[in-house]
């Protein structure tokens, strides 16, 4: 097979999986008009394949979404020009699939499909090379964005340094659980006493009043027990507290400074480490920012995924919430999963609050798993992630 015919699908992975597996010299996409004319989208696909280490010839042919007879005529013309062609019927519209069936019946061209449930390719007609063939491909988080026309941008976290801090994340989260109800005030206090000048490297040494101005005119005093615990687990150093007067300490480094000044960082870092601890993911990224297309400036659309992981050809999208689970957060997560993961992608929302029945029901409707406070407190997150990715059976 030197030529592979792909029935273009709105789910990005359906357009690249068979080409990447069999690596033909030429890929012909029968696609909607907007794709056939979208040079930027086509360049993204070329960039994806280059990133994967090969440069096939890509041909984009506009095809009808609903007229099977027109699609059949196109297929027959392609078959005449490229008699070595094979047909992937994994994606595409109903009309395209109907035409593909007639094409293979008339010409004997090989046809095959991919089963996401089995993660195998199967011979449909005359494609013995694809029969019961296990898909051993593995994609990175960036690959999933690129194949869907997106771009991975730098996020709030330098993922290159996280491996140095892995042993800190569990104690950090245990500290959070102990002081969960006061956590917002604790972080707010640290923010107040550790200001920084714009454009300057923030100082690690902190000195401030014991009581500072809080939100809405309230007063916020140092939580001595929490600060002492942060010192015990070595996130801050040289802690000195003069009750009712002053507090001073030193952040361990700039990274811990950033995490201790952000309410949600503790959960995101804990979720990141949980993904690592499962041992099943080939790539994990904290704070994955994706730009939807090549538009920059005004009109550019980007979103942040708190934690994203990849296991083979299946991505996992994690949303971390240090608050109640809201419908808006569930809807946004579902949109990102569907846009950049497609069918088979997994999504879960992790909350430091108990999940109410309404939110759990909405999550189930959207196919989103829920990991809430009770499972976090009982240390079930690693097990739950394995179950979500079907790497382990659920326990009851």
Protein language model regions, located:
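Short, glycine/charged-rich beta-strand-loop motifs at protein surfaces that mediate ligand recognition
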Residues: 319-321, 347-350
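Conserved catalytic cores of phosphodiester-cleaving nucleases, focusing on short active-site segments
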Residues: 275, 307-309, 315-324, 333
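Short Gly/Pro-enriched loop/turn and capping motifs at secondary-structure junctions
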Residues: 94, 323-325, 353-357
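Anionic group-transfer/hydrolysis microenvironments
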Residues: 90, 289, 306-308, 321, ...
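Glycine-rich, small/acidic residue-mixed loop/short-helix segments
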Residues: 329
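Glycine-rich anion-binding loop/nest that anchors nucleotide
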Residues: 5-9, 89, 319-321
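Trp/Phe/Arg-rich N-terminal binding region typifying the photolyase-homology
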Residues: 86-93
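Long, low-complexity, Lys/Arg-enriched
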Residues: 1-85, 98-272, 277-282, 288-302, ...
């Amino acid at each position: 097979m030197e030529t592979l015919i792909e029935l273009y699908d709105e789910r990005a992975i359906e357009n690249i999986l068979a080409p990447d597996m069999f690596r033909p010299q030429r890929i012909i996409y029968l696609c909607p008009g907007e794709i056939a004319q979208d040079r930027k989208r086509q360049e993204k696909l070329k960039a994806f394949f280059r990133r994967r280490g090969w440069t096939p010839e890509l041909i984009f042919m506009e095809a009808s979404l609903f007229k099977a007879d027109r699609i059949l005529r196109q297929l027959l013309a392609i078959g005449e020009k490229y008699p070595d062609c094979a047909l992937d019927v994994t994606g595409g519209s109903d009309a395209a699939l109907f035409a593909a069936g007639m094409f293979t019946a008339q010409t004997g061209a090989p046809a095959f499909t991919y089963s996401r449930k089995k993660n195998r390719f199967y011979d449909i007609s005359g494609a013995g090379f694809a029969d019961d063939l296990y898909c051993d491909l593995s994609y990175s988080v960036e690959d999933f964005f690129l194949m869907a026309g997106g771009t991975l941008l730098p996020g709030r976290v330098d993922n290159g340094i996280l491996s140095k801090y892995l042993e800190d994340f569990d104690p950090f989260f245990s500290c959070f659980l102990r002081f969960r109800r006061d956590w917002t005030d604790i972080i707010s206090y640290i923010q107040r006493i550790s200001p920084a000048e714009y454009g300057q490297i923030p100082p690690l040494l902190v000195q401030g009043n014991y009581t500072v101005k809080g939100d809405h005119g309230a007063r916020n005093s140092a939580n001595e027990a929490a600060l002492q615990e942060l010192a015990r687990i070595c996130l801050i150093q040289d802690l000195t507290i003069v009750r009712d007067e002053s507090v001073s300490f030193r952040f361990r480094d700039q990274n811990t400074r950033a995490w201790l000044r952000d309410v949600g960082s503790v959960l995101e870092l804990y979720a990141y480490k949980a993904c690592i601890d499962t041992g099943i993911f080939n790539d994990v990224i904290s704070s994955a920012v994706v730009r939807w297309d090549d538009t920059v400036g005004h009109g550019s659309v980007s979103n942040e995924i708190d934690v994203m992981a990849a296991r083979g050809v299946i991505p996992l999208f994690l949303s971390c919430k240090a608050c109640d689970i809201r419908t808006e957060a569930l809807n946004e997560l579902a949109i990102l999963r569907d846009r950049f993961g497609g069918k088979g992608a997994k999504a879960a929302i992790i909350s430091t609050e108990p999940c109410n029945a309404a939110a759990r029901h909405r999550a189930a409707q959207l196919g989103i798993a829920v990991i809430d406070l009770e499972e976090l407190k009982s240390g079930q997150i690693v097990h739950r992630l394995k179950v979500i990715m079907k790497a382990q059976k659920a326990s009851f």
